UniProtKB/Swiss-Prot annotation:
UniProt protein name: Flavin-containing monooxygenase 1
Source species: Oryctolagus cuniculus
Disulfide bonds: none
Membrane-topology descriptor: Single-pass membrane protein
The encoding gene: FMO1
Lumenal side: 2-513
Biological processes, Gene Ontology terms: taurine biosynthetic process
Membrane-spanning ranges: 514-534
Length: 535
């Protein structure tokens, strides 16, 4: 009899979890509280409780070749960075292609998930759900929690003295949908993550004046990177990751700063991150520098005090310390919680949960509950969650045996202590992980990591493409369980799909003898690098 698996949420990770269960002979039942799949990527005009909320203009921050499911590329005619409506269409195509809808119960809220009385023996869970006013209970052999971490807004009003006296409008960025509400208003956006920056830029097209308040600053990069390539196809490669992790942290930090400043000097715009040693995810925005230099967005430091109709900033430089404000948007992030789980199952402290490999509660007697997608890699979340799901089902099936509880708890505690070995980038913030290192570790565990040295002997072109080219998800399907016969072709044609939607006019490309000579030297240097790295 197939093991029954309860899956909470039908977003990108939930859909991947359903597919992984079906592929491995498990029996999944996915509970989705709304009336459709898609999670974060399904736009609605109104905020829905318990669901991530996005604004109308959201576009993916990771390009289509890097943010697809590993055995299901985006359609070739999709833009490289996908608008939310098309991303949702893609998820629906995925669900149709692999017959996932039959495993989803829509309009069903998970009320509670508790251990069965014989949990220490069976590892089973009782799942209580609510559907159209009717409460139901069922027993499952395992549970996969795929609710994400963008549903509970973090709004620390106590950190902003005087906010209760403010006569204007203020709200969390989760409530934002369209820029029309800012027309002819003086707007302050607090927080410089991707959402805060997007909102400030959008508001600047209709508002009277826009201020963006940041305490720690941030690196800002464009989706359009070196030579017009998508940023993550250039930045996220095995070769670059090898170089970054082999150098002392101060050198890596300097190199990263140099690269980030190649678009514009962040110091001249008041944006340089306060802490450059601990890696902070860069902000993706194609317009911000242009809006700042044309006087449409003004960067300000942290808020000192909020008055009835104005805001006072601390340590303002070359500018008034007080500005009249009509609307304040708090883009202050999110907290995460699992209201349907007892704290003894997954305890959240200081923005972290004690999860082995960011998946399994380290203290559970039986590894039958997994949290999928509760991680912040410097890479796409979709293939990360999918790889976590592939790993998880192998644990559920007993193919992978987790280490003793003491070993898992020790690893989790070491991660929480923010220890750093002095080499490579410093991933010391809660939930942060090195994207390539993390996924390679999971792939190794399920025997799905490609052996580049063997490939160098049998298929050298593929090996070199994988090492020096983008770390695209298709690499995760070359071997092991879930192997996809189209993986090699997808890897070798990824640049063709990238340029198909941009090369819409025939142009004459000519190269000088000097350029040809440079390319020859580049090839020779590449071969020497391969020899040194692999031997």
């Amino acid at each position: 009899m197939a093991k029954r698996v309860a899956i909470v949420g039908a977003g990108v990770s939930g859909l991947a979890s359903i597919k992984c269960c079906l592929e491995e002979g498990l029996e999944p039942t996915c509970f989705e509280r709304s009336d459709d799949l898609g999670g974060l990527w399904r736009f609605t005009e109104h905020v829905e409780e318990g669901r991530a909320s996005l604004y109308k203009s959201v576009v993916s921050n990771s390009c289509k070749e890097m943010s697809c499911y590993s055995d299901f590329p985006f359609p070739e005619d999709y833009p490289n960075y996908v608008p939310n409506s098309q991303f949702l269409d893609y998820l629906k195509m995925y669900a149709d292609r692999f017959s996932l809808l039959k495993s989803i119960q829509f309009k069903t809220t998970v009320f509670s998930i508790t251990k069965c009385q014989d949990f220490n023996v069976s590892g089973q869970w009782e799942v209580v759900t609510l559907h159209e006013g009717k409460q139901e209970s069922a027993i499952f052999d395992a549970v996969m929690v795929c609710t994400g971490f963008l549903t509970n807004p973090h709004l620390p009003l106590g950190c902003f003295p005087g906010i209760k006296t403010f006569k204007g409008q203020y709200f969390h960025s989760r409530q934002y949908k369209h820029p029309d509400i800012f027309k002819d208003k003086r707007v302050l956006v607090v927080g410089m993550g991707n959402s805060g920056t997007d909102i400030a830029v959008e508001a600047s097209h209709v508002a009277k004046k826009v201020f963006l308040s940041t305490t720690g600053g941030a690196w800002v990069i464009s989706r359009v990177f070196d030579s017009g390539y998508p940023w993550d196809m250039v930045f996220t490669t095995r070769f670059q990751n090898f170089i970054r992790n082999s150098l002392p942290t101060p050198i890596v930090t300097w190199l990263v700063a140099k690269k980030m400043n190649s678009w514009f000097n962040h110091a001249n715009y008041g944006l340089v991150p306060k802490d450059r040693i601990q890696l902070k995810e860069p902000v993706l925005n194609d317009e911000l520098p242009g809006r700042i230099i044309t006087g449409k967005v003004f960067i300000r430091p942290s808020i000192k005090e909020v008055k009835e109709n104005s805001v006072v900033f601390g340590n303002a430089h070359n500018t008034p310390s007080e500005e009249p404000i009509d609307v304040i948007v708090f883009a202050t992030g999110y907290t995460f919680a699992f209201p349907f789980l007892d704290e003894s199952v997954v305890k959240v402290e200081d923005g972290q949960a004690s999860l082995y490999k960011y998946i399994f509660p380290a203290h559970l007697q039986k590894p039958t509950l997994a949290v999928i997608g509760l991680i912040k890699p410097l890479g796409s979340m979709l293939p990360t969650g999918e790889t976590q799901a592939r790993y998880t089902v192998q644990v559920f099936k007993g193919v992978i045996k987790l280490p003793p509880t003491s070993v898992m708890i020790k690893e989790v505690n070491e991660r929480k202590e923010n220890k750093h070995n002095g080499f490579g980038l410093c991933y010391c913030k809660a939930l942060q992980a090195d994207y390539i290192t993390y996924i390679d570790d999971l792939l190794t565990s399920i025997n799905a990591k490609p052996n580049l040295f063997s490939l160098l002997l049998t298929d050298p072109l593929l090996a070199l493409t994988m090492f020096f080219g983008p770390y695209s998800p298709y690499q995760f399907r070359l071997t092991g369980p879930g192997k996809w016969k189209g993986a090699r072709n997808a890897i070798m044609t990824q640049w063709d799909r990238t340029f198909k939607v941009t090369k819409t006019r025939i142009v004459q490309e000519s190269s000088s003898p000097f350029e040809s000579l440079l390319k020859l030297f580049a090839v020779l240097a590449l071969l020497v690098s391969v020899f040194l790295i692999f031997l």
